Regions:
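Active-site-proximal loop/helix segments of hydrolase catalytic cores
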Residues: 170-206, 210-214, 218
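Active-site environment of divalent metal-dependent phosphoester hydrolases
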Residues: 49, 67-70, 90-96, 111-113, ...
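Active-site HxH/HxHxD metal-binding segment of metal-dependent hydrolases
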Residues: 68-161, 198, 248-260
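Active-site neighborhood of phospho(di)ester-bond hydrolases with catalytic His/Asp-centered motifs
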Residues: 62-64, 83-93, 105-108, 171-174, ...
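Metallo-beta-lactamase
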Residues: 22-23, 27-37, 109-170, 185-186, ...
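Bacterial Sec-dependent N-terminal signal peptides
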Residues: 1-22
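Conserved beta-strand hairpin/beta-sheet module of binuclear metal-dependent hydrolase folds
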Residues: 28-77, 181-197
Length: 287
């Protein structure tokens, strides 16, 4: 009954009006809510979700956001436990504050991108693009701090041991070659980065062919019994069967039955295919 109540809350509400605890952020840049017991979402200026999972022995920070404000201090307001930091992939909106932490776990295929996006000008440009406007410049925004972090490669099956919680890496190439999801099997949660957003971007220059992403979705669809909730990098939580709509969406692109429509953002032009709840923006030349 408790799990059903949590599910109902998650799917009827956004992160910003859940009944979980919220706290005053030390920076006006962030909004912070405890969306499940000892699972915090740090909303990075309404552009991306950063997750903090707190175990009995240590805590796991999943992604670091745009790097536009003092994330380290924000995290330390939530927990004093030893901190592990992992990137779901190497894009600047997910790895932009890596420079604030000493060690970053990331798939080897994305580590060079994560390092490159931590240049101060990269962080500034990304925030401006994502927010669609000039970004305010408080004292803690866009420090000209270079990155000296150590990147440590993780592979499929790697386990982050937090004490009472064990978070498993699942390789999910598609949005980037080194994308990963993070499975909290004990709590039946999947932290999915940009793999399972409402609209998944598969048209960027470093995206894998769509056929590779299709295999990723098939892999996850075979593991639906291991998680009930998807906690994505953008937007609100989704039920696990959202992945089934994604499978059908991509299948319809690959078999040329989808009636797509033009799609354009600051990142470029694409075609958009929709199926059920899912949408995929893709490059017709990269199937």
């Amino acid at each position: 009954m408790k799990n059903k109540l949590i599910l109902a809350l998650l799917f009827c509400c956004s992160f910003h009006n859940l009944s979980g605890q919220n706290i005053q952020s030390p920076s006006p840049w962030f909004t912070v809510n405890e969306v499940l017991p000892r699972v915090w979402v740090i909303d990075d200026h309404k552009a991306v979700n950063i997750y903090l999972v707190i175990g009995t022995d240590s805590a796991l920070l999943i992604d670091t956001g745009m790097g536009a404000a003092d994330l380290f201090t924000q995290v330390r307001k939530l927990t004093a436990k030893p901190l592990i930091v992992v990137n779901t992939h190497g894009h600047v909106d997910h790895a932009g504050a890596d420079y604030q932490f000493g060690k970053i776990y990331i798939h080897a295929a994305d580590s060079s991108d994560a390092r490159a996006c931590n240049l101060p000008e990269s962080r500034a440009n990304a925030a401006k693009n994502l927010l669609g406007r000039a970004v305010p410049q408080p004292a803690d925004t866009y420090k000209k701090q270079e990155i000296h972090s150590k990147f440590v490669a993780v592979k499929d099956g790697y386990i982050f041991d937090l004490g009472d919680r064990h978070i498993q890496v699942i390789e999910t190439p598609g949005h980037t070659p080194g994308s990963i999801c993070l499975l909290d099997k004990g709590k039946k949660l999947l932290f999915s980065g940009d793999n399972d957003n409402t609209a998944v971007w598969l048209f960027l220059p470093n995206c894998t062919p769509l056929s590779v992403y299709y295999k990723t979705l098939q892999k996850l669809s075979g593991r639906l019994s291991e998680f009930d909730l998807l906690l994505p990098g953008h937007g609100i939580p989704k039920k696990n069967d959202f992945i089934l709509d994604q499978v059908e969406c991509v299948k319809s692109i690959l078999n040329h039955t989808c009636v797509s429509e033009p799609y354009e953002t600051f990142a470029g032009k694409a075609q958009l295919c929709k199926y059920g709840q899912a949408s995929v923006a893709y490059n017709p030349d990269n199937l």
